[in-house]
């Protein structure tokens, strides 16, 4: 949660980053280094394809989609297959009573900045699983 949209959301919603770290600790062998970065053990872990749901308020949940293990400006780190797997998990989660009927929002170019993904591919995956979703782009 040190960059991009995750960083902005963590600043806006106190408790998100702590809940995220607890989720990772419970679901994958990892440690945070003294500077707050995940160690290499996590980067080879099995978080790909999972989601972490955080209740920000009564009618807003934030879903962390684990579609990449690392960031790089030189090569693609995002996994389209892992994103599809996570979306399938999210699709099932959205059937729960507390989540039914809530609007869905996805950040524009999700997985494309530090993850190196292709937005045309990502937007097609989003539209396939969640055609009713709104893509949000912050003004620059």
Language-model regions, residue ranges each:
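Macrodomain-like recognition of ADP-ribose-binding/processing modules
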Residues: 1-140
